[in-house]
Curated annotation (Swiss-Prot):
It is an enzyme of class 6 (ligase). Homodimer. Its cofactor is Zn(2+). Zn(2+) binds at C368, H419, H546. Keywords: Aminoacyl-tRNA synthetase, ATP-binding, Cytoplasm, Ligase, Metal-binding, Nucleotide-binding, Protein biosynthesis, RNA-binding, tRNA-binding, Zinc. It is found in: Cytoplasm. One of its GO terms (cellular component) is cytoplasm. This is Threonine--tRNA ligase. Catalyzes the attachment of threonine to tRNA(Thr) in a two-step reaction: L-threonine is first activated by ATP to form Thr-AMP and then transferred to the acceptor end of tRNA(Thr). Also edits incorrectly charged L-seryl-tRNA(Thr). Belongs to the class-II aminoacyl-tRNA synthetase family.
Length: 695
């Protein structure tokens, strides 16, 4: 278990008034351009990133930021996005600029152009970018004297004009063009003449020169709505990635290739797990029989563990009257994420006039308000607490079409939602118990590389007393630290109603996924007037804890599919065993073996198709079937089978009763490793002699 790799923080250095930050970096003997740990910007005492050309008015201490840090890579990628935009406008002079932010592992820039970009365009653009990088153009910050000055300079850039006029988006991390108290541009200067070659509206910061971009490539292009709103113009987006060294870029590209092979959307089709029919609409998946098996196993194991942990199962409807979400505050705080209302129960006169107005009903975006109604349905005593309500509840959220992504971002989902009501005195023990339950259950599914994130109060947006927030935050911190996992702070990242712990999981490719959340809520108990009778007879508010362990079943399914590259652990696999006869005459024998396995609860098929045996082995290997049992004349005579595994190894001549017991044992142990000839132990204890198979 580990947190994301982070370079050791750099020691602060002093910048003398009237000199540049870059001079202080050089005086300190720190790495410069060309090294993976070259300093690209500095961080001031307020946490703001500054260009190396920044000149402070007084002596200040700053922290150098290296290229191989998260912030350093982000600056390099932002500068690479500018180089891309310059190349596009040189190749396509009529192109209008959108925005070009750094993103996780890369960058993009949006353009309004007459035709979509082609792969040939990307090749030509990358070549032009390499020339700009080689030229060593200087990034120079310039402050506009006024909005009018900025408008005049950017009169031919309609999207930039919109950003100038709409500074409400200044704090949006994806809108790098505006921010702070100033409107600024970054000009690219010819290093020899210092003449302006190109420029862009931008708040920065940037690397000193284009040569500080050691390694980059363009990856793809796509359509994208301006500012992510489908009511706006459709632009063309070019994606790229940039890194601190060629070695780092090569590693990233290898990871991308492997991620593409593991893409759950691709595997969902190849393995016949799920699909997204156009007739249903965007973000609304259907699970096929094989996907249904995996989903059922996920849910049933979770259900059993929840029952053992003292949870009580509930069920709630998919729609509700408007008033519930007025009470909960969702219509005030979350209306943009909800589907439009349905008006129901109106009554009309014969002439069409309304005799009785209808009521607005909503698809539920969250299960919690309905769980609060269950809690409130009768009086509660402290003796009933903690009360742990759990539901596999379907919810519906309006996601913009541009952000929908396979199973990991959908509009219709099933959440494994729990709400825990406890006393303030029980809060710490319940949180500790809950966190351990979450970690143990995720590990049972094969995800066991964790770190934690603690989201704390936004001082400008919160409900409840400071004392309660402080107590709850410190309690969460103590619980997180006692787990022994790394804890990453997320200052100001909490929702307005309480602090939370997020469990971050690293998958087989080293990618981080936010998986489970444990959220304290000081708002809902008041809104719903939730109470319990304490030991002294007084009425008190319970502490409310929200918890979604998987996030959603759909998202967890997608993450597991990619983590295992579609080769699910045997206990989750849609088909656990397939019998492959050497010839048609051996199919009946394997039917008998299959019948024994079915009686023991194993999902098994016999391939009686007309394909040759070698073809069958290839087909079922591609379908990720974990156990293949082969049988020919010698096996039938000996009452045996031969094991064939996905890594091409075999165990030949295994007595059928031993084969059945070995498979049943593997499934019952919920072993997450992929079975191989080396790992499978036969009940007799005899040593196996694995052999390499053909084909």
């Amino acid at each position: 278990m580990s947190a994301p790799a982070r370079p050791a923080p750099a020691a602060p250095i002093r910048v003398t008034a009237g000199t540049t930050a870059g001079q202080a970096v050089r005086d300190a003997g720190l790495p410069s351009r060309g090294a993976p740990d070259a300093v690209v910007v500095v961080r001031d005492a307020d946490g703001r990133l500054r260009d190396l050309s920044w000149v402070p008015d007084t002596d200040v201490e700053v922290t150098p930021v290296a290229a191989d840090t998260e912030d350093g890579r982000s600056v390099i990628r932002h500068s690479a996005a500018h180089v891309l935009a310059q190349a596009v406008q040189e190749m396509f002079p009529d192109a209008k600029l959108g925005i070009g932010p750094p993103i996780t592992d890369g960058f993009y820039y949006d353009f309004d152009v007459a035709e979509p970009f082609t792969p040939e365009h990307l090749q030509a653009l990358e070549k032009k970018m390499r020339k700009i990088v080689k030229d060593g153009q200087i990034f120079e910050r310039r402050v506009f004297g006024s909005k009018d000055e900025a408008r005049a300079e950017l009169a031919s850039e309609p999207y930039k004009l919109e950003l100038i006029d709409d500074k409400s988006g200044a704090d949006d991390p994806e809108v790098m063009e505006v921010g702070g108290d100033e409107l600024t541009a970054y000009d690219n200067l010819n290093p020899r003449t210092r003449e302006r070659v190109w420029g862009d509206l931008c708040r920065g910061p940037h690397i000193p020169t284009t040569r500080y971009i050691p390694a980059f490539t363009l990856t793809r292009s796509s359509a994208a709505y301006w500012r992510g709103d489908q009511n706006n113009a459709s632009l063309q987006r070019i994606y790229g990635t940039a890194w601190e060294s060629q070695e780092a870029l090569d590693r990233h590209l290898e990871l991308i290739e492997e991620a593409q092979r593991r893409d759950h959307r691709k595997l969902g089709v190849e393995l016949d797990l799920f699909s997204f029919p156009d007739e249903l609409g965007s973000g609304l998946p259907v699970f096929h029989p094989k996907g249904g098996v995996v989903r059922r196993e996920l849910e049933e194991y979770s259900r059993r563990k929840h029952i053992e942990a003292g949870y009580e199962f509930v069920n709630t409807p998919h729609i509700t009257k408007e008033q519930l979400y007025i009470t909960s505050g969702h219509l005030e705080w979350y209306a943009d994420g909800m589907f439009p209302p349905m008006q129901i129960d109106a009554e009309y006169n014969e002439d069409g006039t309304v005799r009785k107005p209808g009521q607005d009903y909503y698809l539920k975006p969250m299960n919690c308000p309905m769980h609060h109604l269950i809690y409130r349905s009768r009086g509660r005593s402290y003796r009933e607490l903690p009360l742990r309500l759990f539901e596999f509840g379907s919810v519906y959220r309006y996601e913009k079409s541009g952000v929908i992504h396979g199973l990991t971002r959908v509009r219709g989902m099933t959440q494994d939602d729990a709400h825990i009501y406890c006393t303030r005195e029980e809060m710490r023990d319940e949180l500790a118990r809950l966190l351990q339950f979450v970690l143990d259950l995720l590990a049972d599914y094969g995800l066991d590389d964790f770190y934690l994130e603690l989201s704390t109060k936004d001082p400008d947006k919160f409900v409840g007393s400071d004392d309660l927030w402080e107590e709850a935050t410190e309690t969460l911190r103590e619980v997180a630290e006692s787990s022994g996992l790394a804890l990453v702070p997320d200052p100001g990242g909490a929702a307005f109603y309480g602090p939370k712990i997020s469990v971050q999981v690293r998958d087989a490719l080293g990618r981080n996924w936010q998986m489970s959340t444990i959220q304290l809520d000081f708002n809902m108990p008041d809104r719903f007037e939730l109470e319990y009778t304490s030991s002294d007879g007084t009425r008190r508010r319970p502490v409310l804890i929200h918890r979604a362990l998987f996030g959603s079943i759909e998202r967890f399914f997608g993450v597991l599919t990619e983590h295992y590259a579609g080769a699910f652990p045997v206990w989750l696999a849609p088909v656990q065993v397939v019998g492959i006869p050497v010839a048609d005459a051996h199919a009946g024998y394997l039917d008998g073996v299959a019948a024994e396995l079915r009686r023991r609860g194993i999902r098994v098929e016999v391939d009686a198709s007309d394909d040759r045996m070698a073809k069958k082995i290839v087909n079922h290997t591609n379908q990720k079937v974990p156990f293949m049992l082969l049988a020919g004349d010698k096996d039938v005579e000996a009452g045996a089978v031969s094991f064939r595994f996905g890594d091409r190894t075999q165990i030949n001549g295994v007595p059928r009763d031993q084969a059945v017991e070995a498979i049943v044992d593997w499934v019952n142990r919920r072993e997450n490793a992929t079975p191989t000839a080396e790992l499978v132990v036969l009940p007799s204890g005899d040593a196996q002699s694995p052999v390499a198979g053909e084909g």
